[in-house]
């Protein structure tokens, strides 16, 4: 935290951070990240420990709040990568590798609990963004990232832009019907 004096008025400048969440079929990893991309704190929670996404969000909030208080930082946003994460709808849609069934309004749940904007995308698309900004695809305009974990997915980048498709599900390969 920085403290500035401006005509007998103190202004407190608190470091701002984002929360990154990777929801997987086995574990949910999270990290508190500063503006430079440094991970200030991280952890994981077992996905199967939560009967509902609401239970998960409440437990995540308690865990992250402690870290934010210890670091004396201000959370300004949340980014989520999840199987069948739909960027357009803010939902996780019928993910075969999660025990939570149906359409889950994850962005709504996180925004309500944390009080900051949240965004979601498919976990493989999030991996493609990570590779484009920090990893092996840095400087590349066209590439595909294929992920294999509890599920199978891909993130497609064409001309430096992530491809979402008309419904937000472009690149989903793990639980889609395929013609061979």
Question: Predicted regions: what is each one?
Answer:
Residues 2-3:
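Cationic, low-complexity basic patches in intrinsically disordered or flexible, solvent-exposed regions
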Residues 27-29, 126-128, 151-153:
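Short glycine/serine/threonine-rich phosphate/pyrophosphate-binding segments
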